[in-house]
Amino acid sequence: MDKRHDPSRRIIAPHGSQLSCKSWLTEAPMRMLMNNLHPDVAERPEDLVVYGGIGRAARDWDCYDKIIEVLKRLEDDETLMVQSGKPVGVFRTHADAPRVLIANSNLVPHWANWEHFNELDKQGLAMYGQMTAGSWIYIGTQGIVQGTYETFVAVAKQHFGGVAAGKWILTGGLGGMGGAQTLAGTMAGFSVLACEVDETRIDFRLRTRYVDKKATSLDEALAMINDANASGKPVSVGLLANAADVFAELVKRGITPDVVTDQTSAHDPLNGYLPQGWTMAQAADMRKTDEAAVVKAAKASMAVQVQAMLDLQAAGAATLDYGNNIRQMAFETGVKNAFDFPGFVPAYIRPLFCEGIGPFRWVALSGDPEDIYKTDAKVKELIPDNPHLHNWLDMARERIAFQGLPARICWVGLKDRARLAQAFNEMVKNGELSAPIVIGRDHLDSGSVASPNRETESMMDGSDAVSDWPLLNALLNTASGATWVSLHHGGGVGMGFSQHSGVVIVCDGTEAAAKRVGRVLWNDPATGVMRHADAGYEIAKNCAKEQGLDLPMLKD
């Protein structure tokens, strides 16, 4: 019997202002853990899988139940320790210490590979936390939408003079992360053709308004794209097909998309990528009997897909890796020039990271969408001179369906995060919001990740693989008084390829919270500016000087 599987479970976080725990500092992590497993949020909630292949919220259902039990009794001077999804200890700390400290899927580097991890996983000794799955701040696909939108806007600026109309994106994957591509693409003005082997995922994206149409053949999908481009109104199409098959077929037909990328779960060849010619049932059976054969077949198909991406790049498509490590998998399978197309961070996002700009997100613990709409208005009020941000907030309200507890994401940086958080805390204090807000972020941020094939690819000083930075980030956020802090390994790109940290803090309207958010939400993005200034980026150095950061080795 698999202790991680229970189809009878249906988890819905409490709404409103009534507490189940002893304070909002423990109610918040409880609600956010539960929200990660909401049926409209998680990919496979019955298996505790939130997104990203096997990214889980808790190690098994016994651990989940015990975490909830402990949070309900936890005092405001105690800290719960969670080791790979398992609650292992409660310790007396102090009121400004985190209420929860989390470490997920961390392995000593020599053993940091999927083979060793999968053995531990089967024995119930580890859990893959992805990034926000095991750190309890996943907000559904919205969590990656703006970052994807910003990337596609940058693609349009670099390659098409800022005009995306009449252009289309080819991609793969409509899971928790990949599902953002279709909506983000159309918001940026592109049509999008996304390949997905799991029809339930396409239907889920249709239901939550992330995909406009479904197609069951390539010809049908291309006709939809062509019609949209002719009309000038972008459309997103979920095509029920294997991405490797479709990408290679387009090369064969001589059809070149304007943009090519991919967000299949290629980071996990055993659980995340369906080999060409295989059914999902066949793959599920083979995972139980011959894991090595599954991995070999999946990586062979990834090699086919990456080769097609290279061919489409040669034919004129703007081609980019979107951080799922598919280039690495193809390289290991013989595609020696797999890294000839760039990752999205060095190509489009790094200048934002240099100013500490990244995926700032917040969630209304009340469950009331009006609380989010009021905070949207507050963001516009406090950042009046950023029409791009205002446009994003307007589009998000109009086009993004909330999943689980209402939430919002917007990319802001060092200059704005702390003051926005303090304003939100004041709104809770004054009764403008019906319950406290939690503020967090993706681990994909400027100072919180070391990932040489994604966020820290091609650092100008060669420090791509130095992982001191996310460790320092986690330590500083803990010292600064975050409500919960997490330190993970393997998110996004898989075992052995990344280390990263997460942070969440509660705005409960108290003066103590105002002080904590002021520290945490200044220091957290400041570590990103520090990291990039240390690597030699002039934008980061200038930002550090402008904001008065004390960086001892930064020369005037």
UniProtKB/Swiss-Prot annotation:
The record's Gene Ontology cellular component field reads: cytoplasm
Q: Which reaction does it catalyse?
A: 4-imidazolone-5-propanoate = trans-urocanate + H2O
Primary localization: cytoplasm
Annotated NAD(+) binding sites: 52-53, 130, 176-178, 196, 201, 242-243, 263-267, 273-274, 322, 492
Entry's Gene Ontology molecular function annotations:
urocanate hydratase activity
So where's the catalytic machinery, residue-wise? Answer: C410
Role this protein plays: Catalyzes the conversion of urocanate to 4-imidazolone-5-propionate.
The entry's protein name is Urocanate hydratase
UniProt gene name: hutU
